[in-house]
């Protein structure tokens, strides 16, 4: 079967934003204009097409990044049909993992900002993730019809807070309730969308006289930015004082793909203005799979290899999301980087070392699905029938194996205990939690050895609340949930040398393991490190991995309160063995004993997670909010003014003090303040806090 759309006409984009910037509405409009949806779904009615889990529709926030395929030929049908895969990503800070996961498989992103709120803390997180994966992006300033909307303020915030290099390619005509349309700086025309056709039609007119000077100034900045793309364009610009439309687009496209600039547009998705222009920019300025470097990976012989985005390359793909669908069972969303695969073919998963048969292949449109026979380089689709694959796994041609770079997922910062309400729930709960943990790598499940309770861990209160809710709805499991617990860590502050000796000789085969370890603090963030410094075979080679294994197991539970020990370095420098009685188990035990004894002498310390908190509050409640943050051991780090007497307070607060904060910030401000928080780093807990935690254990 030949390719329907050439790969150069593919765009794999993510739509990413802070909660409430209007991202889901923007995506809905894209689906409407590209002809997929005939009735626009509104988030207000809980009917948005991309938000397809029940909780999302109730809460009006997006949790799962559903992948959708649509086609666009331009506002004037000026392009050949382009195949656009959209990955909708959540804006709530507890779901940052979803954003991270979709950034890995995108070629480009559209960042949506609210014209009133501008750049929010979550926007900074998403921006950092896009930088980490080198994702080219454009910015869309939404909600231009809202009171307090200011496009140019958001341009400045992108420069200041995100260190971005925004280049507006349109400027707004009016703002707030007088927002009428945009000036297209490339064509130098004013564009007004027709409200009766829900923005399907538009008029291009002369630029209003009062905007002529502004438009000329912004156009000049845009043309200069385009000219910097190459020497050839710069010479043209210097000679002629301007560039042709085609040259401007070429220059902007080159620099956008190189992540040097971010084209900026604006509009109001809710009122059907501006999204159409953004779609044109996606086609003109964002990369196709062949415009970005080939994907890299590790070949079977451990050397580095790569795969070009071409049909004639060997097949390679990355599984980036797992979902349980009520009708077809487990769906694995995957991005094809190279080659072609048909339903029924065998793929190899090098991470699990297993071959699997690819069952049906589905192209997803939010929650509707279309069965297709094959997928090619650049496609994003969902597979049914893969039993082994989990998020971040590579799928490839069994004859030409490559392992693509795996994703790294953050450690959870909060735990709660869950108890099934009945015996029948007990069995179903294990299955349900296993399924949910498979879908979401930032969610962990374990059994507490002492209490026998099931402990679930995640990225925040909302994250766990929604997972428990899904367990109730999708798996019919009723469970009661305990109070949230903080994920403390332990570390050491001093270096010590410690002996560990495990000897058991009571008839028959004995056990003998003996080690000397240097135990010292490691650099923050470095984690666990093991160094083998044995000379002259005093501990035989074959037992050294057992020492490493014993230590790895031991650091999962520290001596203060049983929390994992982080940032610690072990050097095995001496020891002894017995010809007959020594074995791996004995050395594992000896290492574990040395760690337990040594840690007690190495000034063990409790670490607690600190959160970056931002509170937006009307000025009159500022005192209450600041006082409350201080009473929670918060350190205020700065303040900013926003439109309409709103103040933004930034602080660092220990997570243990933030439980139930949403209720208390509402009562402090009569429901008018909002806040967001995300994990920042671990820091030493004050003595009184550490003692309280240790005594509780």
UniProtKB/Swiss-Prot annotation:
* Cellular compartments annotated: Cytoplasm
Keyword hit for GTP-binding: yes
tr-type G domain ranges (all copies)? 8-290
Q: What is its main location?
A: cytoplasm
Give GO MF terms, alphabetically.
Answer: GTP binding; GTPase activity; guanosine tetraphosphate binding; translation elongation factor activity
Q: Which GO terms describe its biological process?
A: ribosome disassembly
Query: What's the name of the protein?
Result: Elongation factor G
Please give the organism: Dechloromonas aromatica (strain RCB)
């Amino acid at each position: 079967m030949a390719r329907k759309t050439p790969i150069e006409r593919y765009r794999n984009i993510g739509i990413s934003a802070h909660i409430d910037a209007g991202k889901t509405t923007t995506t809905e409009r894209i689906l409407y204009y590209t002809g997929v949806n005939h009735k626009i779904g509104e988030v207000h009615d809980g009917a948005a097409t991309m938000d397809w889990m029940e909780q999302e529709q109730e809460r009006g926030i997006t949790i799962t990044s559903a992948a959708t395929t649509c086609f666009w030929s331009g506002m004037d049908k000026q392009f050949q049909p382009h195949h656009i895969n959209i990955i909708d990503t959540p804006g709530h800070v507890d779901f940052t993992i979803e954003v991270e996961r979709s950034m890995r498989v995108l070629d480009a992103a559209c960042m949506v900002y609210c014209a009133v709120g501008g750049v929010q803390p979550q926007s900074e997180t998403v921006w950092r993730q896009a930088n980490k994966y080198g994702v080219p992006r454009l910015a869309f300033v939404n909600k231009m019809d809202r009171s307090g909307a200011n496009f140019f303020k958001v341009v400045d915030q992108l420069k200041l807070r995100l260190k971005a290099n925004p280049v507006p390619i349109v400027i707004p005509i009016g703002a707030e309730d007088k927002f009428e349309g945009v000036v297209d700086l490339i064509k130098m025309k004013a564009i007004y969308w027709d409200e009766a056709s829900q923005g399907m039609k538009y008029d291009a007119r002369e630029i209003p006289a009062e905007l002529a000077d502004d438009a000329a100034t912004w156009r000049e900045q845009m043309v200069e930015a385009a000219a910097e793309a190459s020497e050839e364009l710069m010479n043209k610009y210097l000679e002629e004082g301007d560039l042709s439309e085609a040259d401007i687009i070429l220059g902007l496209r080159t620099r956008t793909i190189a992540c040097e600039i971010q084209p900026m547009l604006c509009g109001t998705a809710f009122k059907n203005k501006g999204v159409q222009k953004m779609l044109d920019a996606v086609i003109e300025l964002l990369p196709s799979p062949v415009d970005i470097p080939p994907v890299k990976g590790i070949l079977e012989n451990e050397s580095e290899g790569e795969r070009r985005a071409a049909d004639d390359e060997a097949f390679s793909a990355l599984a980036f999301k797992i979902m349980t669908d009520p009708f077809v069972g487990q769906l694995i969303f995957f991005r094809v980087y190279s080659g072609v695969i048909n339903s029924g073919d065998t793929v190899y998963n090098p991470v699990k070392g297993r071959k699997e048969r690819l069952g049906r292949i589905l192209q997803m449109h939010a929650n509707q699905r279309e069965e297709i026979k094959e997928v090619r380089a650049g496609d994003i689709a969902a597979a049914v029938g893969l039993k082994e694959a989990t998020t971040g796994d590579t799928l490839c041609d069994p004859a030409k194996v490559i392992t693509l770079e795996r994703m790294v997922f953050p450690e959870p910062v909060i735990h709660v205990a869950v108890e099934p309400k009945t015996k029948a729930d007990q069995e179903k709960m294990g299955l349900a939690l296993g399924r949910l943990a498979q879908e979401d790598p930032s969610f962990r499940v374990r059994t507490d050895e002492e209490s026998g309770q099931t402990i679930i861990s995640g990225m925040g209160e909302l994250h766990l609340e929604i997972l428990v809710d899904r367990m109730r709805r999708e798996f019919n499991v009723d469970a009661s949930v305990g109070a949230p617990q903080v994920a403390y860590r332990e570390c050491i502050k001093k270096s010590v040398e410690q002996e560990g000796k495990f000897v058991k000789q009571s008839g028959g085969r004995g056990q003998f393991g003996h080690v000397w370890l240097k135990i010292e603090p490691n650099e923050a963030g470095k984690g666990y490190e093991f160094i083998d410094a044995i000379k002259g075979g005093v501990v035989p080679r074959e037992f050294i991995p057992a020492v490493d294994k014993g230590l790895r197991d031991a650091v999962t539970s520290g001596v203060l309160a049983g929390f994992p020990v982080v940032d610690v370095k072990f050097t095995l420098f001496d020891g002894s063995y017995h010809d007959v009685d020594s074995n791996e188990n004995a050395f594992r035990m000896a290492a574990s004993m040395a760690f337990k004894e040594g840690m007690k002498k190495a000034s063990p310390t409790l670490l607690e997670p600190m959160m970056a908190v931002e509170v937006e509050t009307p000025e009159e409640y500022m005192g209450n909010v600041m006082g409350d943050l201080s009473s929670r051991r918060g350190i205020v780090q700065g303040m900013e003014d926003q439109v309409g007497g709103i103040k933004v307070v930034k602080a660092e607060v220990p997570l243990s003090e933030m439980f139930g904060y949403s209720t208390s910030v509402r009562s402090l401000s009569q429901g008018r303040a909002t806040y967001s928080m995300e994990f920042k780093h671990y820091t030493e807990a004050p003595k009184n806090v550490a003692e309280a935690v240790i005594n509780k254990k």
